[in-house]
Design a protein with these regions (language model features):
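Conserved P-loop
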Residues: 1-81, 87
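Short, glycine/charged-enriched secondary-structure capping and boundary segments
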Residues: 21-22, 42-45, 94-97, 142-146
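Switch/connector loops and helix/strand junctions flanking conserved nucleotide-binding motifs
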Residues: 37-40, 88-92, 137-144
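Alpha-helical scaffold elements adjacent to nucleotide-binding pockets in ATP/GTP-utilizing enzyme cores
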Residues: 65, 115-118, 157, 161
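Glycine-rich phosphate-binding loop used to anchor ATP phosphates in small-molecule kinases
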Residues: 76-87, 108-139
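Oxyanion-hole/transition-state-stabilizing segment in secreted/luminal serine hydrolases
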Residues: 78-102
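Substrate-gripping "pore-loop 1 plus following alpha2 helix"
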Residues: 95-117, 144-153
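Phosphate-binding/switch region of NTP-binding enzymes
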Residues: 122, 127-162
Length: 162
């Protein structure tokens, strides 16, 4: 059973910058934000030629990459980073914004839930790090709590940080 780590923080708090300390020979970064990494010279270490960097926010493509790392030709990879889950949600929501049915919200919830629940099914020596933006809310009793920022109320019920 692989390990899952959720790293949450406000935008600009250093989540992506912290990745510079990871070993590029055993780390694969899925750049869902498609903005590149935030430190100088990152392209020397993370690129398609090194087979350790891929830009997509498509959940089916992310799942395909994770399956390839798990059982395919990338067995040397020990750490996978998805940066960020929020962009996966936002892109799916925007791509389907003209749809008027409730189904799109159920599909979005299922796709993100699918990533989060399947992480534990990968090989034992694999760690999957999901990066996400955080949101701080107050409940009806005035207690403050921080959770993963989500798109839509259906996804608010997901509690991956628990």
């Amino acid at each position: 059973m692989s390990r899952a780590i959720l790293v949450m923080g406000e935008s600009g708090s250093g989540k992506t910058t912290a990745l510079r300390t990871l070993d590029p020979t055993t780390t694969f970064i899925i750049d869902a934000d498609r903005k590149g990494l935030s430190w100088r010279g990152w392209r020397k270490s993370y690129n398609s030629a090194n087979k350790n960097y891929f830009q997509t926010s498509s959940v089916p493509k992310i799942t395909e990459v994770l399956n390839r790392i798990d059982k395919g030709d990338l067995q040397h990879i020990k750490t996978v980073v998805i940066d960020t889950l929020n962009m996966c949600m936002t892109d799916d929501e925007m791509n389907r914004m003209r749809e008027k049915t409730f189904d799109k919200w159920a599909d979005l919830a299922w796709s993100i839930w699918g990533i989060l629940t399947n992480i534990h099914l990968y090989r034992d020596d694999l760690t999957v790090v999901c990066m996400a933006h955080s949101q701080t809310d107050r409940d009806e009793n005035g207690y403050m709590f921080t959770r993963m920022k989500t798109s839509g109320r259906k996804l608010d019920k997901l509690v991956p940080e628990a």
